[in-house]
Amino acid sequence: LLQQAEGYEHYDDMQHGFDILDDVIKKAREYAEPGAIRFAEEHKDDKVLHVMATGANYNVAYTTTTCILMECQWIHSNPIHSGEFFHGPFEVVDKEVPFLVLVGVGREREMDERAVDFLKKYGKRITVLDGKEFGIDILGATVAEYLSPLVFTGVLSRYSHRLADARNHSVYVRRYMWHVPY
């Protein structure tokens, strides 16, 4: 639509990104599997887990906290925008509070890295998922930041299922949804 309405400058790059996206997601999910297993073992007993990201990836953080951690696993969680981290949320950082950070490949990467640097200095239970490690860059410099949420969603699907397995708490179990009027 953008191409038809306005003449999108990076239309060909975006088309190429879409052409290879499935392969990038598949490889990213395979690459992520060992980390997902470690993450699940390290966090299976957690009562709270914060997820941080910025840019287009913030929506992935929001979905992970709301739909996966709170709805499916009953873990208290909060999506934190990396650009807002130093406006209050950084005050909860200590050696016990777990954070999952999605580091993007686009213009906002510097904000993600700044937050990660702080977490590594003052925290301990930090899991960093770096888009560069998942091959997001191969999608093309002009469009990778827009397609990266799709890759992170695929990767976090692995993480959520491994966490569910480690907790012996299926992602399909609900307390209220589909059971009581609301």
Identify the role of each PLM range.
Residues 1-182:
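A SIS-like phosphosugar-recognition module
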